[in-house]
A protein has these predicted regions:
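Cytoplasmic helix-loop-helix junction between adjacent transmembrane helices
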Residues: 109-146
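Helix-loop-helix hairpin linking two adjacent transmembrane segments in secondary transporters
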Residues: 143-190
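Structural signature of the two symmetry-related core transmembrane helices
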Residues: 81-95, 279-293, 373
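Extracytoplasmic gate region of multi-pass secondary transporters
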Residues: 34-35, 212-262
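Conserved MFS/SLC helix-loop-helix module at the cytosolic interface between two early adjacent transmembrane helices
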Residues: 65-101
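Helix-to-loop junctions at the C-terminal end of transmembrane segments
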Residues: 66-78, 264-276, 360-361
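Residue-level signature of mid-helix packing/kink "hotspots" within the transmembrane helices
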Residues: 32, 60-68, 151-152, 258-266, ...
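C-terminal transmembrane helical hairpin of 12-TM major facilitator-type secondary transporters
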Residues: 276-322
């Protein structure tokens, strides 16, 4: 009888990562859709390029900087209501971006959307980790792929809605996000049952935080973020400048990158069952260095596209297991670990991107991409460090 109860409980827990994935889709639909609203703001509201760039920066900074704070709140007391409020604010913020007239109110609305995004990630990732049971990397993979689905759907929804209804079409995000916020709110009691850290012990490890080990994983995740931003920012421009590719054709490269990245994220949980996270990280960074070099040296558009496919797989295949490992290193601060992994690591990529852009302006895009290859080599060094930490832990265990 008790065996049936355990099986039923596991079944309910196994559904929770998909429910959390839905929340992740909602907040990243809003964040992904913001960029596609910008051209309409320039044309219909008369904002300058500088003003709309500041708009995106305000949203991203608000999201990235405040995420660890919400993670710390979750470490002190389980607050699953943060997710429902976060989904509601993410949708409300971008909905108001299209209807407000004052520029500074639009900036404030973008920041509200970013804060909503920040509210979901730490608590959602913490609960995905706890709901994962013995297969935490799979649970994190399910949660993470929601973000990529959201980023893919956001631009489609924004363009379709604003084209059909004008800037007030952004109100569609209320219809998307508010109902799901209510779903998450209704499930708060079930989420509360996991507590702050869950009831189980960490297999093969003590329960003390290991900040040094966490920092090494965070270094690898930060490198991943910089390379990710670099690929999406510079690779289409490189194809246009080097091979005279049409701008719309070069932009399709990002679609290919997104599709293969989503496939890799969805496969990450299965990969982690066969390959330990440190080995997966090492393999991905080795292929990353090779792919970046191949992109520059190939001399063929199609080989460049193939290199981008491999890069997309490498950048996303190791990410959910690495985030789960980072959380495992901070068992007493799961929310903080989640906030740093999803917030600060991503912010590093956003901060580095303009610096790489300045290098591209002064020394050429190829130089910027070679820097990405060097950074990927640094990511390999971080990954080797993680593997060494795991070996030491195994010997002590």
């Amino acid at each position: 009888m008790s065996g049936n109860k355990d099986k039923s409980k596991r079944g309910r827990s196994n559904k929770l990562p998909f429910i959390l994935m839905g929340g992740h889709i909602c907040v990243d639909v809003a964040q992904g859709g913001l960029a596609s609203v910008l051209p309409f703001l320039v044309i219909q509201s008369g904002f300058s390029y500088t003003e709309i760039t500041a708009l995106v920066l305000a949203s991203n900074v608000a999201s990235a900087v405040i995420q660890p704070l919400f993670g710390l709140m979750g470490d002190k007391k389980a607050r699953p209501w943060l997710m429902s409020v976060g989904v509601a604010l993410a949708g409300l913020g971008i909905a108001l971006v299209g209807v407000l007239q004052s520029y500074w109110l639009v900036v404030l609305a973008a920041m509200v959307s970013g804060i909503g995004n920040a509210m979901l990630h730490p608590e959602g990732a913490r609960l995905a980790y706890l709901a994962g049971g013995d297969d935490k990397a799979m649970s994190m993979s399910i949660f993470s792929v929601g973000g990529q689905i959201g980023f893919c759907l956001g631009p489609i929804i924004s363009v379709a809605a604003v084209t059909a209804f004008g800037l007030s079409g952004t109100l569609v995000y209320l219809a998307l996000c508010l109902p799901y916020a209510l779903v998450l709110l209704a499930l708060s009691r079930r989420f509360l049952a996991f507590g702050v850290r869950g009831g189980g012990s960490l297999a093969g490890r003590g329960k003390r935080d290991r900040w040094g080990a966490f920092g090494v994983v965070l270094g690898a995740l930060s490198v991943r973020s910089i390379v990710f931003y670099g690929v999406t920012s510079f690779f289409p421009l490189y194809l246009v400048a080097t091979f005279n590719a049409a701008e719309d054709s070069a932009s399709l490269l990002i679609t290919v990158f997104s599709i293969f990245g989503a496939m890799a994220t969805a496969s990450a949980g299965f990969a982690s069952r066969r390959v330990p996270a440190p080995r997966l990280m090492i393999g991905c960074f080795v292929l990353m260095v090779a792919s970046l070099a191949s992109f520059l040296l190939s001399g063929s558009v199609w080989l460049c596209v193939a290199a981008v496919m491999v890069l997309a797989m490498c950048l996303n295949l190791f990410n959910p297991p690495a985030v789960a490992l980072a959380q495992e290193y901070l068992p007493e601060h799961l929310g903080t670990a989640s906030g740093l992994a999803f917030g600060v690591a991503v912010a590093v990529g956003g901060i580095a991107s303009p610096m790489l852009g300045a290098l591209g302006d002064s020394a050429g895009l190829a130089s910027a991409i070679w820097v990405l290859a060097a950074l990927a080599a640094a990511g390999l060094a971080f990954s080797l460090g993680v593997a060494a930490i795991e070996r030491r832990g195994a010997r002590k265990g």
